[in-house]
Amino acid sequence: MAIALSSSSTITSITLQPKLKTIHGLGTVLPGYSVKSHFRSVSLRRSAVVVSAITGASSGAGIGKGTADSLDTVKVLDLRGNEIPISDLWKDRKAVVAFARHFGCVLCRKRAAYLAEKKDVMDASGVALVLIGPGSIDQANTFVEQTKFKGEVYADPNHASYEALEFVSGVSVTFTPKAAMKILESYMEGYRQDWKLSFMKDTVERGGWQQGGILVAGPGKDNISYIRKDKEAGDDPPVEEILKACCA
C-alpha cells in the first residue's frame, strides 16, 4: 500500500522477516525485506462511500442506471496497450473482476493470490478471472511478471472505471487500524509491496489513496449480478461469497 503524506513528515521504516515460502500465483518470496516509507504531498480527495454486496440480480440491477451508462464509455488497456471497452470483458461470458488499489499494493497482491487459488473452481464453471489496476501498462506487465497471476490483467490509467463505479478514495479509508493489521498479516504471510511501482507517477499523482472492489458480471454487458466496494484498504470479502455469486 503506497504511503503518501506531507513532504515534511518523518520517514520511518519497518523491517519484517517472514520465513521463505512459495505462494500460489505469486512464486517464491525472500525473507529479510526492509520496507521504507516514502512521503509526498498530495491533494486529499475522497469520493462518496458506497458499499454494497448484491447477488442474484440481473440486467444491471446491482449498479444504477447512471453507473451503467458511465461504464459504457470506459475503456481499459490490455497488456499490449490495446483499448478495450470494459463491458467487453463480460459481454459474452461471466467474469469475476477484481479492482486493485494500485499495482504495487501489498494488499492487492494478497487479493490476487486468494482469488487465483480458486481459479480452478471458476474455470470449471466457465468463469473468467480478471484484475484491473489504476496505472500504466508497464506497471501492469511488471505486476504480472512479479506475481505470475494466472488471470487476465488490464490497466486503467485514467481511473475511469473506478470513478464510474464510485469506488471510495481518501486518507481516512487508507490508514485505518484494520488496514494496518491487514498489512502486517500480509507481510508475515510473505507478500511484498513493490515500492518502485507504488511511487511511479501514475500512482503518486492520485496519492495512493484509491480503494477498489470486486464485481461479478456477465454474460451481457449490463448484467452485473454482484458488486462489493471496499470500505477501506484490505477489505476483502470472504472468497466463499464471491464463489457463490459466480459459480453456484
Swiss-Prot record:
Question: Short name of one Pfam family for this protein?
Answer: AhpC-TSA_2
Q: Which cysteines are joined by disulfide bonds?
A: none
Q: Which InterPro entries match?
A: PXL2A/B/C (IPR032801), Thioredoxin-like_sf (IPR036249)
Q: What are its GO cellular component terms?
A: chloroplast
Transit peptide located at 1-52
Keywords annotated in UniProt? Acetylation, Chloroplast, Plastid, Transit peptide
For this protein, the record's SUPFAM superfamilies field holds: Thioredoxin-like
Q: Which residues carry this modification: N-acetylalanine?
A: 53
* Record's keyword annotation contains Chloroplast: yes
Give the subcellular location: Plastid, Chloroplast
Q: Which family does it belong to?
A: Belongs to the peroxiredoxin-like PRXL2 family. PRXL2C subfamily.
What is the protein's given name?
Answer: Thioredoxin-like protein AAED1, chloroplastic
